[in-house]
Amino acid sequence: MVAKNIKYNEEARKKIQKGVKTLAEAVKVTLGPKGRHVVIDKSFGSPQVTKDGVTVAKEVELADKHENMGAQMVKEVASKTADKAGDGTTTATVLAEAIYTEGLRNVTAGANPMDLKRGIDKAVKVVVDQIRKISKPVQHHKEIAQVATISANNDAEIGNLIAEAMEKVGKNGSITVEEAKGFETVLDIVEGMNFNRGYLSSYFATNPETQECVLEDALVLIYDKKISGIKDFLPVLQQVAESGRPLLIIAEDIEGEALATLVVNRIRGGFRVCAVKAPGFGDRRKAMLEDIAILTGGQLISEELGMKLENANLAMLGKAKKVIVSKEDTTIVEGMGEKEALEARCESIKKQIEDSSSDYDKEKLQERLAKLSGGVAVIRVGAATEIEMKEKKDRVDDAQHATIAAVEEGILPGGGTALIRCIPTLEAFLPMLTNEDEQIGARIVLKALSAPLKQIAANAGKEGAIIFQQVMSRSANEGYDALRDAYTDMLEAGILDPAKVTRSALESAASVAGLLLTTEALIAEIPEEKPAAAPAMPGAGMDY
């Protein structure tokens, strides 16, 4: 077993503080409209330029193992906030440092760390309740654009694109961010359900130029097994041919005689048909086929449910206004399923998302929900250089997450103003705490609430304490606009923060800072000293 180095009490806390401060100093310069960039060296390729707090935090690794523990714990604050709300990572880091630094001062002065933590937790609950009270729901396209613009570092182009995407696909829709080939940043909307499986034969294409198969007013056959023989398949094909409507077949696979028959029918100018493989794998495939069945108002023909392909009839088939199949993907537009069944399916998927503990499963469920309920929007980020594109993509990601958070829990006056407006409520709560150290813990949170505003002001070259006093003396929604160096009504000016982001930042910061304050010992491995390399033999330098 490797020997360990142990630090106790005051020495341990000093090491943690140094690690926390080192990481926070690197992250907090990015806060606010006048926040600076951080350039990160990469082992390959060009350096990364970013203003994203969590990206900066993830890159910090300190040489001193004990200091590194403090840095890693605060890194966790940024990561947890990013996971919960997708934005607000810099605010969370600033709050964590403020709570820990002030808490440490009190622990050193003799306060009980456990009581301090209890006081911090109680104060955070009061502030979170107040945040929920003062938040207002997002109602207009304009407000969504404002939230996205602020989160994208005041880039109105990005803000408007995200607002447009949200409007097109709805709050359950999926917005993905990709790198574009050119200079322009553009928005593509894929309406209806789209999955990445194309036709099984190019003979199915109806448009030779685009190489797409377009079926109008189509029937949809959904089967969860392979189709290879034509015998079982023929009865339903004859019924479809008699109906005169085109047919989309989705099955695990279609091969041999069955595929050959469909291709020959297509070449000879028979009824329009297209065959595609089912999307997904395993249990996820079955769930996606059920989604398609509900969307189109058809049935999943499955032998597990006692159904056989040979007994299938027109009533079991789904219906869609339009189906577009390319070489690589399939889009079903305006499936004619029942609205109630579709809503029930969406609610069921939402419940699964809440219950799931796996990030991968959540992501896949979210994709299914988006495809069922709204559609998919793709924002393709373009820029003149790769470095600029990556930096811009980071900002688009932040803005997208902030917008989703705003729709979920509403909006607050931005620029750190909302936390300042919670100070009177917390002051009124203090006398209710009878334990003196718990009261000190609550006062630590009280003081920390002004830290984000002070940091925004400092990054704009102003004195944070003076700006704080000015904002405190003003009415509810009035705050400091660092971009224009003016005091204004933040809601009217469109300087907004999502309530979920502010709440998550405070909760994550207080949680980790509280743990650090109650730490009394640090254990780290003693780094092994590697022997110096032997000097080169004479003549080994090859200097002829």
UniProtKB/Swiss-Prot annotation:
ATP binds at residues 30-33, 51, 87-91, 415, 481-483, 497. One of its GO terms (molecular function) is unfolded protein binding. Induction: By stress. Changing residue 124 to A: In strain: L2. It is an enzyme of class 5 (isomerase). InterPro entries: Chaperonin_Cpn60_CS, Cpn60/GroEL, Cpn60/GroEL/TCP-1, GroEL-like_apical_dom_sf, GROEL-like_equatorial_sf, TCP-1-like_intermed_sf. Keywords: ATP-binding, Chaperone, Cytoplasm, Isomerase, Nucleotide-binding, Stress response. It is found in: Cytoplasm. Its EC number is 5.6.1.7. It holds the Pfam family Cpn60_TCP1. Changing residue 217 to E: In strain: L2. GO terms for biological process: chaperone cofactor-dependent protein refolding; protein refolding; response to heat. One of its GO terms (cellular component) is GroEL-GroES complex. It comes from the Bacteria. Changing residue 189 to V: In strain: L2. It catalyses: ATP + H2O + a folded polypeptide = ADP + phosphate + an unfolded polypeptide. Forms a cylinder of 14 subunits composed of two heptameric rings stacked back-to-back. Interacts with the co-chaperonin GroES. Belongs to the chaperonin (HSP60) family. Together with its co-chaperonin GroES, plays an essential role in assisting protein folding. The GroEL-GroES system forms a nano-cage that allows encapsulation of the non-native substrate proteins and provides a physical environment optimized to promote and accelerate protein folding. This is Chaperonin GroEL. It comes from Chlamydia trachomatis serovar D (strain ATCC VR-885 / DSM 19411 / UW-3/Cx). The gene is groEL.
